[in-house]
Amino acid sequence: GYPHYNIKKLDDNKWSIELALAGFSKDDIEIEVKDNIMNINGELKTEDNEYVYKGISSRKFSKSFTLAEFTECESATMENGILSIILEKNIPEDKKPQKVKIK
């Protein structure tokens, strides 16, 4: 479905989601994270032009990603039609597995 995207692993606790959004600006896009769901919505502001031919899509979109527990959106940047979102998993110390020494 639209938009096309890649998910890259940057390290054990960090990922990047890149969405191809040619024609969109950062002002056309909204990112919201709630209850481990990241929703990305976009809508191009339409102009009242009279087209002889219209081959470039100006649709709106909505894309959702389920995030692992303790995953946070670290940053989002828009460059050359690519929206890059950096996600990082930050497990609190009291939730990490505890190693038990055997005596």
Predicted regions and their residues:
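Alpha-crystallin/small heat shock protein
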Residues: 1-103
